[in-house]
Design a protein with these regions (language model features):
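A metal-dependent hydrolase metal-coordination microenvironment
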Residues: 3-126, 159, 166-182, 198
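Active-site-proximal loop/helix segments of hydrolase catalytic cores
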Residues: 28, 121, 140-156, 171
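Short secondary-structure boundary segments
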Residues: 50, 143-144, 168, 192-194
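Short acidic/histidine-rich active-site segments
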Residues: 184-202
Length: 210
């Protein structure tokens, strides 16, 4: 029986960190192009984690009222769901929060949650992360050791995340190695409920980078 089961094992691939245009200002690929791209690679699904309202979102949107910004923000995800249903790939919502070049991937909160919590735009980042965790979100620090010209120093938040992203192919290998060390030594030993280690699989050919 075990032999039969082992032969039937199936590996499912999910992209957990990607950006789409026009919501994320850094992205070049449209939602449809992105969803079709991951479908062509054999992925079972993807999380659309565009930069949130506090980050690298389309600049003209930031002058709109909060709920209008949310409508624009979630429009890519909603279009992604429709495209996924057409071609047979699951599309899930996520967001990427930003704080002075430090980014966090948030999973498990839908549009209605953000509509009910406009106060997050005025909260300290640690308070915002804690509120999201208390609301059931999974919080992952993205590329914690990324080095860019606009990042003046590395910031770590071990008490306000469930895990860290340890694979990001847009980063140097040394940055991923340090993230894995941090995850396996500091984060994994904290006395909190941890269910997964943050990971993201980027295609080097993808135009949607984080």
């Amino acid at each position: 029986m075990d032999d039969v089961l082992s032969k039937r094992k199936i590996m499912y691939k999910y992209e957990t960190h990607c950006h789409t245009s026009p919501v994320s200002f850094c992205a070049k690929a449209s939602v449809a192009e992105t969803v079709q791209f991951y479908k062509s690679l054999g992925y079972a699904g993807l999380f659309i984690t565009n930069h949130f309202l506090d980050g690298n979102i389309c600049p003209s949107v930031k002058t709109l009222p909060y709920n209008d910004q949310l409508d624009f923000y979630f429009s890519d995800y909603e279009a992604g769901v429709r495209e996924g249903e057409k071609i047979g790939i699951s599309v899930f919502p996520g967001i990427e929060l930003s704080y002075k070049g430090t980014d966090f991937l948030i999973y498990g909160l839908d549009k209605s949650w953000f509509q009910e919590h406009p106060e997050i735009m005025e909260m300290k980042k640690t308070e915002e992360l804690q509120l999201m965790m208390d609301s059931g979100a999974l919080v992952i620090q993205a590329h914690p050791y990324r080095e860019e010209y606009y990042i003046n120093h590395i910031r770590l938040f071990p008490r306000h995340v469930h895990g860290v992203e340890v694979i990001n192919t847009s980063q140097k290998e040394e940055a991923n190695e340090m993230a894995a060390l941090y995850e396996n030594t500091i984060i994994s030993w904290r006395p909190v409920d941890r269910t997964i280690t943050g990971q993201a699989m980027y295609s080097r050919n993808s135009a949607a980078k984080g």
